[in-house]
Amino acid sequence: MAADISESGGHDCRGDQRSNTKLDADYPLRVLYCGVCSLPTEYCEYMPDVAKCRQWLEKNFPNEFAKLTVENSPKQEAGISEGQGTAGEEEEKKKQKRGGRGQIKQKKKTVPQKVTIAKIPRAKKKYVTRVCGLATFEIDLKEAQRFFAQKFSCGASVTGEDEIIIQGDFTDDIIDVIQEKWPEVDDDSIEDLGEVKK
């Protein structure tokens, strides 16, 4: 019954998937999966790390890599030189493509690991304590803010990129509390700036 449909339904069924099948293909199909992104090799170009996928394919399956590069070569324009092409590829990598994960961001370790504590006057005899630099030790600021608010029974908020404001003067106690909670922050990396104007 299935043979009758496939023989007669070639022109009449426009939406039928069977009319698009390759006649010379052997079923079941054998699909080559990439060792880097675990997708079929045809889809590697849509992943953010295309270069790694191509290196893997070239190393493990050079004949498939040759087919892939021959198929993609007519798409490239003849007028673009090597230098211009690589700059365009770098810019294209930065932008997230539809459906992909986007560029994987590298963490920067150039910032010195130092926690600074300052007492800032507010109104009359009221003060706030500013703690900066906890993010350089890869401490979650939201978690630290909740911890300080609970520990000192006061309001605390994350205000800047790497800044926590605690309502009240806790400069004496906070150094011990930080070292107790996060032992990776040693005594040498904590600096008390004293009273600082905003």
Curated annotation (Swiss-Prot):
Residues that the record marks as modified (Phosphoserine) are: S73, S189
Q: Which residues carry this modification: Phosphothreonine?
A: T86
- BP term (GO), one: formation of translation preinitiation complex
- Tell me the segments the record calls region Disordered: 1-20, 72-110
Q: Which Gene3D superfamilies match?
A: SUI1-like domain (3.30.780.10)
Query: Do the record's keywords include Transferase?
Result: no
Looking up PROSITE patterns in the UniProt record yields: SUI1
In which residue ranges is the amino acid composition biased (Basic residues)?
Answer: 95-110
SUPFAM superfamilies recorded: eIF1-like (SSF55159)
Q: Where is the composition biased (Basic and acidic residues)?
A: 9-20
Report the residues modified as N-acetylalanine: A2
- Report the InterPro entries cross-referenced here: DENR/SUI1_TIF, DENR_C, DENR_eukaryotes, DENR_N, SUI1, SUI1_dom_sf
Q: Per the database record, which ranges form the SUI1 domain? A: 115-182
What UniProt keywords are attached to this protein's entry?
Answer: Acetylation, Initiation factor, Phosphoprotein, Protein biosynthesis
Role of this protein: May be involved in the translation of target mRNAs by scanning and recognition of the initiation codon. Involved in translation initiation; promotes recruitment of aminoacetyled initiator tRNA to P site of 40S ribosomes. Can promote release of deacylated tRNA and mRNA from recycled 40S subunits following ABCE1-mediated dissociation of post-termination ribosomal complexes into subunits.
- Summarize subunit and interaction data from the UniProt record for this chain: Interacts with MCTS1.
Q: Family, per the entry?
A: Belongs to the DENR family.
* Name assigned to this protein: Density-regulated protein
> What is the originating organism of this protein?
Bos taurus (Bovine)
Upper lineage: Eukaryota, Metazoa, Chordata, Craniata, Vertebrata
